[in-house]
Amino acid sequence: MGVSSSLSLPAGKMRRFMHRIRVPADIDSVTGIDSASECDPLEAGIGHAQAESIWQAVQALYRTGYYPAVMFCLRRQGRIVFNRSLGHVRGNAPLDEPDAPKVLATPSTPSCLFSASKAITAMVMHRMEEHGQLNLLNPISHYIPEFARHGKERTTIYHLLSHRAGIPGIEGVTDPRVVLDHEQSLRLLCEAEPLHLLGRRQAYHAVTGGVILAEIVKRVSGMDIRKAWRTWFKEPMGLKVLDYGASERVRARMTREALTGIQGCSLVDDFARGALGATFGEVMELVDTADFYRAVIPSGNMVTTAEEASRFYQMLLDGGRCNGRQILRAETIQRATMEVGPHVFDRTIGIPLRFSQGFMLGGEPFGLFGSRSHNAYGHIGLVNNVTWADPERAISVALLVSGIPLLAGNIGALIRLMARISSACPRSSLSA
């Protein structure tokens, strides 16, 4: 297999400083296509040239050299247009030797959603409200009385889902393994003093929100959130992989995560500590353990294939229906995806973001999910995993990657991919 000379890795210290994969000169040799599931793009209202432009943008993203594996699924009008993969599950990470045994990724390769898990966890909560089990406007302390300490008695589930609960992190905790201990995490959050009260400020809650939500599910329904997910969503939807964590059998097929881009930058480490409570390197060490996938981390460890993530969002587009079953009511989805407020500066991430109760929202003239995507909703995971639906374009999309670029030249390719999808899938005439 040839290697593109333009992306060949430098040796020695430079290779340790800039992490990139070896990109094959012939990327068709590392491409997987589930042709049995894909339709003719014309059947989904996409011209062949437009479809090819999308795929070329996915290939360009892989060619940046920052992603050992890319899995991509796009549905339009309910039909699968792309269900494909590029790269390797293992054997071609930046620090792997050139002759390391290589395992190709496939369209059905599972990968971790990281923070994109939050949107799915949010729908578990909205489903409970739909069935009268809780009220999202109730204070969290209504369900977890000990959470009321330090003035948090009026902080609601609504505030938590929209990243306005004032507990974006756990002060003084530097060991990322605390997320593996639900009871300890819950105790620390109940004892925590909020940074602000009554939802006055938006600060992205990277991990903390999921701990509280999981405890509410357990106390109200009597089930842990993994069992609730399986009972209410996974089994009725016929999902085989999408779940909190992963079994040993699923984990054996998963992508191996790798840090890519510039390494050793103190600014990146400082940002990660502020958002995640640990550096990206420390997070990756945790993610590389079996304990991480045995645990239930509602804000960050759901595992899925690209097709199943796309299927979940297609269910939302279809008014809550999947496989002939009503999983959610249409009005529940409408409430879940309704904006909480306009784009505001997020005090954790440091950029303007717009949220609903559980989803990141698109924008005008350009947003997280492409151009003119004001009504799109979804979530990103560690910046590069992107899952979303755009009702005006009738698309449900999942882009899963195994590389975690820190400072790298990947953002332009990612933006161009989003723009290509927006261009190839125009908004309906009623919304244009």
Segments and roles (model prediction):
Residues A44-S111:
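Short, conserved catalytic-motif segment at the N-terminal edge
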Residues V81, T106-S108, I120, H126-P145, ...:
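Short, well-structured active-site flanking segments
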Residues V81-F82, T387-W388, A394-G403:
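Short, well-ordered beta-strand elements
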Residues E52, V58-Q59, G78, T109-N138, ...:
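Active-site SXXK
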Residues D318-R321, L328, T332, T337-F345, ...:
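Short, gly/Ser/Thr-rich active-site loops of penicillin-recognizing serine hydrolases
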Residues H150-S371:
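Short, surface-exposed loop or secondary-structure junction motifs
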Residues M14-A51, Q357:
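Short, compositionally biased leader-like segments
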Residues L61-R63, R347-I351, N375-I380:
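Short Gly/Pro-enriched turn/cap motifs at secondary-structure boundaries
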